[in-house]
């Protein structure tokens, strides 16, 4: 079954290739293709003018934005900054370190230090001697 499919696929490709090489696959008139080619050339030639115009517009806009940003950076804030961080305070005046994360806070309980008995050696049978040596 697979051999039949492979043979038919090769036959269809061979027929398509022969028709395409003879020019009978697409029934498109030569005048239509010439008109299409000239339209493509016209469309390709106009974007260069449009691209130049848009490039100059973009550079002008970028220069204007750059100037506005530099003017904004030069302005000194006269309003007093709030000393607390919370809801209602402007986001640009909050520092990242002052933001409190709301969540479950666990109480830290100080446990008294556990005192173990007499120190044992590794095996645990004999007491360690207090004398050196």
Swiss-Prot record:
The alphabetical list of record keywords is:
Amidation, Cleavage on pair of basic residues, Developmental protein, Differentiation, Hormone, Secreted, Signal
Keyword Signal listed? The answer is yes
Which residues are the signal sequence here? 1-27
Q: Please give the InterPro entries that the UniProt record associates with this protein.
A: Osteocrin (IPR021088)
Tissue specificity, please?
Enriched in neocortical regions of the developing cerebral cortex. Not expressed in other compartments of the neocortical wall or in brain regions such as the hippocampus, striatum, mediodorsal nucleus of the thalamus and cerebellum. Also expressed in bone. In developing neonatal rib bone, present at high level in osteoblasts on bone-forming surfaces, in newly incorporated osteocytes and in some late hypertrophic chondrocytes (at protein level). In adult bone, localizes specifically to osteoblasts and young osteocytes at bone-forming sites (at protein level).
The record's listing under Pfam families reads:
Musclin
Biological processes per GO annotation: cell differentiation; cell surface receptor signaling pathway; endochondral bone growth; hormone-mediated signaling pathway; negative regulation of D-glucose import; negative regulation of dendrite extension; negative regulation of osteoblast differentiation
| Residue numbers bearing the Arginine amide modification | 132
Kindly indicate whether the keyword Mitochondrion belongs to this entry.
no
Induction behaviour: Expression is induced in the developing cerebral cortex in response to neuronal activity in neurons: expression is driven by the presence of a enhancer sequence only present in primates that binds the MEF2 transcription factors.
For this UniProt entry, the molecular function terms from Gene Ontology, in alphabetical order, are: hormone activity; signaling receptor binding
Q: Where in the cell is it found?
A: Secreted
GO CC terms in record: extracellular space
Query: PANTHER family of this UniProt entry?
Result: OSTEOCRIN (PTHR35353:SF1)
- Outline what the protein does: Hormone that acts as a regulator of dendritic growth in the developing cerebral cortex in response to sensory experience. Induced in the brain following membrane depolarization and inhibits dendritic branching in neurons of the developing cortex. Probably acts by binding to natriuretic peptide receptor NPR3/NPR-C, thereby preventing binding between NPR3/NPR-C and natriuretic peptides, leading to increase cGMP production.
Oligomeric state and interaction partners are given as: Interacts with NPR3.
- Give the family this protein belongs to, as stated in its UniProt record: Belongs to the Osteocrin family.
Name under which the protein is recorded: Osteocrin
**Organism name:** Homo sapiens
Q: What is the lineage of its organism?
A: Eukaryota, Metazoa, Chordata, Craniata, Vertebrata
What gene, per UniProt, encodes this protein? OSTN
